[in-house]
Amino acid sequence: MRSENTALAARMPAQVDDLLAEVDTPALVIDLDRFERNLVAMTEAVRGNGVRLRPHAKSHKCPEIAKRQIAHGAIGICCQKVGEAEAFVAAGISDVLVTNEIVGAHKLARLAALARSAAIGVLVDDPGNVAELAAAVAHARSTLEVLVEIDVGAHRCGVAPGRSALELARAVASHAGAGLRFGGLHAYQGAAQHLRRPSERRAAIARAVECARDTRVLIESAGIACPTVTGAGTGTFVLERDSGVYTELQPGSYVFMDADYGRNELNSSDPVFAQSLYVWTTVMSAPAGDRAIVDAGLKAFSVDSGLPLVADRPELECTKASDEHGVLRVPSGAKNLRVGDKIRLVPGHCDPTVNLHDWLVGVRKGRVECVWPVSARGALL
């Protein structure tokens, strides 16, 4: 393990006090001023509205960022995998909701063991999984908070709202003396986050709110307390915040933003979060006046939401990418790029882009202020 850590440190793209121009490429760079403004903007957007903030750490996978979110008022974090939860708990995060169904004896044993060290929550949408969780916590002598996931329109995981959710809540509550605690409902409408028009997002979240409200009423009318309704993302959290139904919000991308979120239309009253995350690259080849090649490709940025944008030269276009190359088109009349020039790219999707990097380089006023490990990257298990 020591040799692995030494090798990882040797791949650090920068050291504190380096100039930005000295940061090795490709690297993932954070504009710290913008990042910190985003933290404050989310705190102000949530404060005084009777809801809790539990940011989704799948976006950054970085304990240093999670600690800053908690310092700005978050009650804890969300993550998606047991391995991610383990990384955050090891770094001192004490309240983690795994917003996923966890299946398989080995993963369940790890999750139950982790719950001896921190407050851990998890989702279910299957009665058999409830029984497996109960067996795991009994063996580990721990306690898990369990939320029933309902499908509110994303058509991914989740039982149907209504009676199916009630039956699952009853199954969880039946194990109350054996280490499972029913925590409420998980009602995340992920598909709504990137609907471009505000009216589309409002309609999608209105349906989600109705599903969550009716299901909570049904569960509570059966004598089961339903203290939490959690969900929301960066694209819609204002709607869930104002719904009177959601008690907890899970935005994640707001700390960084990305090109795809930048395509969303906003209402004039919506909070504005600044682009703070960039892929820092170097022009490695300029074989023709209309074309330049940078040293960042598919192994440095995700393209599931489109190719990256060029931050400081909007007239340039990233036209394609291969494993280690990004191709930029230089239009006629634009200033040519030269070998060695540095370029900032805005990734199409921040979450999977972060997962490609070992380090986040924090920069302020052109100088490296911090280098943070992406401790939960690659935690697929």
Regions found by a protein language model. Give the residues of each.
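A charged N-terminal "starter" segment
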Residues: 1-113, 377-381
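Glycine-rich tight-turn/loop motif centered on a GG-T
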Residues: 20-32, 95-98, 112-122, 196-206, ...
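Conserved, mostly hydrophobic/aromatic
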Residues: 35, 58, 88, 148, ...
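Alpha-helix-loop-beta-strand connector modules within alpha/beta enzyme cores
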Residues: 42-48, 62-63, 98-103, 125, ...
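Active-site-proximal beta-alpha core segment in soluble small-molecule metabolic enzymes
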Residues: 56-195
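Active-site loop/helix belt of alpha/beta enzymes
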Residues: 145, 151-266
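Active-site loop ensemble at the mouth of alpha/beta enzyme cores that anchors a bound cofactor
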Residues: 201-203, 236-314
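C-terminal accessory subdomain/extension
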Residues: 287-381
